[in-house]
């Protein structure tokens, strides 16, 4: 898992929806996630490339994928 500058483990969280993938970044030993943007769903290869780019940009060593089914 990648380390952030403080030496903690960086986790990128994905909330996959029909039109967007929401991104949140957290540090494993902190537990609070913060918004990190979103990816518009497009062609599968372009969307996958955008996810890989986000992982690299955030320096994530772990990826957590969620599937939000409702807002309640």
What is each residue range found by the language model?
Residues 35-60, 72:
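N-terminal phosphate-binding loop and adjacent alpha-helix
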């Amino acid at each position: 898992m990648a380390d952030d500058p403080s030496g903690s483990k960086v986790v990128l969280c994905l909330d996959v929806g029909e039109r967007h993938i929401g991104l949140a970044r957290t540090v494993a030993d902190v537990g609070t996630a913060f918004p990190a943007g979103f990816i518009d769903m497009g062609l599968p290869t372009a969307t996958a490339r955008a996810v890989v780019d986000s992982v690299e940009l955030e320096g994530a060593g772990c990826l957590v994928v969620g599937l939000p089914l409702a807002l309640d």
